[in-house]
UniProtKB/Swiss-Prot annotation:
EC number(s) on file: 6.1.1.19
Name this protein carries in UniProt: Arginine--tRNA ligase
Annotated keywords: Aminoacyl-tRNA synthetase, ATP-binding, Cytoplasm, Ligase, Nucleotide-binding, Protein biosynthesis
Organism: Mycoplasma capricolum subsp. capricolum (strain California kid / ATCC 27343 / NCTC 10154)
PANTHER family to which the protein is assigned, alphabetical: ARGININE--TRNA LIGASE, CYTOPLASMIC (PTHR11956:SF5), ARGINYL-TRNA SYNTHETASE (PTHR11956)
Encoding gene (name): argS
GO cellular component terms given for this protein: cytoplasm
UniProt motif ('HIGH' region) ranges: 123-133
Reaction equations catalysed: tRNA(Arg) + L-arginine + ATP = L-arginyl-tRNA(Arg) + AMP + diphosphate
Length: 554
């Protein structure tokens, strides 16, 4: 059976709708009112007026038709017109075969023939990644996995901010640390970056160049020798990009395309975009500045592109970059994962791209709010490395990759998050990641015990898997495709974590209640082993989306 159980019920309802000339779409709920295995639909309520019938009368008509399908062990009508059905256990048991046949592909949606380009992290190459970048990295990488599972072709993008004043400040920061490492009394400007990481880079530069730059002067944002300034900029960018790439790899984040802001300048993309705006009559001059007509696409005011002193505003290179990305990637949708402080920037970016002739909806922003670390009941600030940020590498030393990824994915990205470091290191059921990985460990333990006893799992259509928790779990496993679809549509990493927790909650209860390996009832034991394999496979598939590993033993 290739259809899911929910698709079967939907198809049955849809066929009846067509027979009765009903155009409404059936809506289905699972395990309603905490009734294991119950499928419920409000189709009779929402369509009764269309056929001029009372909801209860229409529900009785639907019941008669559903009985003819021979798919349901129970069909009940509840006021004021709900249809509640229980699928026959033998039909429900086919879920196991579906899962174990498709394995890692279980839950995959049909190919969408659409390209989604996701830009995430995009931290300035001015230092290490911090905990805010970590949340962005998790949300972005989980969305990548989720959209792939949902049938999209997904491209990953990191925008390197390697132009602009922050890179000039970086060069001066590293230069000052270089001078200080040579025991020269060099005063660090107030706007420079803080942290011992710059000492490490300064030592590398000294090893290669010795003290040949010791007599060169500097300002707040400029080394007063163009060649040396350019050298320190490039060395610093290369050094921190290499570190960022390694830190992301260690955090199970893989980004394929790294685009450069400096390249946008060097290839004159900004000038090309300015000409394009003029050719489309999308810009105008006022008080010596060049404005963009963003109010035509819903912005609250027109935005300055070029100031009266002929310098560019921040939005112009961003618009050029995104326009270039649309042409380069041929993506149907650009999704940028941005920090919450960028909210006011969204409408002007969308308007600016639309004025270039792009689809006004092609750019979508996924907001990621701040994350605060809590330890011993209060905000946690690290002092291992001097500086103001809490570094990703330090957090990973405390809690590990899987725990941090899971917890950062488990809350809506659009809400502020307190991350309890004490909670995620506990080894009990109050810790969501431990609770989830303990479920996979238990599955492995059961299957290993059976292997030792030489009992092999059995997968076949059966009515023996009729325990309420078995029925409830089978329906939840069956619903995986719907969870993938809804999570992708809602851009929700949290829904996948909620799904995992739901499976684990029922499974742990089932494990405590049922003797799974019963050598006095080998047929049921073998069927339950197949059931356990299916649970493990779906958990593995869900874990893969989050980017964490199933645990074999604990």
């Amino acid at each position: 059976m290739n259809r899911t159980i929910i698709e079967m019920f939907y198809d049955d309802l849809k066929n009846i709708c067509q027979k009765f000339n009903i155009t409404k779409e059936p809506i289905i709920e699972i395990n309603k009112n905490n009734t294991p295995g119950l499928l419920s639909s409000s189709i009779c309520l929402i369509s009764s007026k269309q056929v001029n019938k009372k909801p209860l009368d229409l529900a009785n008509d639907f019941k008669e038709q559903l009985l003819l399908t021979n798919n349901y062990s129970s069909i009940q009508i509840a006021n004021p017109g709900f249809l509640n059905v229980l699928v026959k256990p033998e039909i429900l048991s086919n879920v196991i075969s579906n899962v174990l046949t498709l394995k890692s592909k279980y839950g995959n949606l049909e190919k969408q023939n659409k390209i989604i380009n996701i830009e995430y992290v995009s931290a300035n190459p001015t230092g290490y990644l911090h905990v805010g970048h970590a949340r962005n990295a998790v949300i972005g990488s989980v969305l990548v996995n989720l959209f792939k599972k949902a049938g999209y072709k997904v491209q990953t993008e990191y925008y390197v901010n390697d132009a602009g004043n922050q890179i000039n400040v970086l060069a001066v920061t590293v230069f000052v640390h270089y001078l200080q490492a040579l025991n020269i009394d060099a005063k660090k400007p107030e706007n420079c970056y803080a942290g011992e990481m710059y000492d490490d880079l300064a030592k590398i530069i000294i090893n290669k160049y010795n003290d040949q730059f010791k007599d060169i002067k500097y300002t707040d944002n400029k080394i007063l020798d163009d060649n040396v300034h350019s050298l320190f900029k490039q060395i610093s960018i290369d050094y921190f990009l290499k570190i960022i790439k390694q830190q992301l790899a260690d955090f199970n984040v893989k980004i394929r395309h790294w685009s450069s802001e400096q390249e946008v300048y060097d290839t004159h993309q900004i000038e090309k975009v300015l000409k394009l705006y003029k050719s489309k009559d999308a810009s105008y001059y006022k008080d010596g500045a060049e404005f963009l007509k963003t109010t035509q696409f819903g912005d609250d005011k027109d935005r300055v592109l070029v100031k009266s002193d002929k310098t560019y505003t921040y939005i112009l290179p961003d618009l050029a970059t995104h326009h270039l990305r649309i042409k380069r990637t041929k993506a149907d949708k650009l999704i940028n994962v941005w920090g919450g402080d960028h909210h006011g920037y969204i409408k002007r970016m969308q308007a600016g791209l639309a004025l270039l002739g792009n689809d006004p909806d092609i750019l979508e922003i996924q907001m990621v709010q701040m994350v605060r670390l809590i330890k011993d009941g209060s905000e946690y600030k690290m002092s291992k490395r001097k500086g103001t940020a809490v570094w990703l590498v330090d957090i990973l030393e405390l809690v590990g990759v899987d725990a941090l990824r899971y917890m950062l994915a488990s809350k809506s990205s659009n809400s502020h998050m307190d991350l309890d470091l004490d909670l995620i290191t506990l080894k009990n059921s109050s810790n969501p990641i431990y609770y989830a990985q303990y479920a996979t460990a238990r599955c492995h333990s059961i299957l290993n015990q059976a292997k030792i006893k030489k009992i092999t799992p059995l997968v076949k259509e059966t009515n023996l898997l009729n325990n309420p928790k078995e029925i409830e779990l089978l329906l939840i496993l069956d619903n995986f495709k719907e969870v993938i679809k809804n999570s992708a549509n809602n851009r929700s990493t949290q829904q996948i974590c909620d799904y995992i927790q739901n499976i684990c909650k029922i499974f742990h209860s089932y494990y405590a209640e049922i003797k799974i390996i019963d050598e006095n009832n080998l047929e049921l034991t073998k069927l339950r082993l197949g059931f356990i394999k299916a649970i493990l496979q779906v958990l593995k598939n869900a874990f893969f989306i989050i980017g964490i590993q199933p645990v074999v033993e604990m």
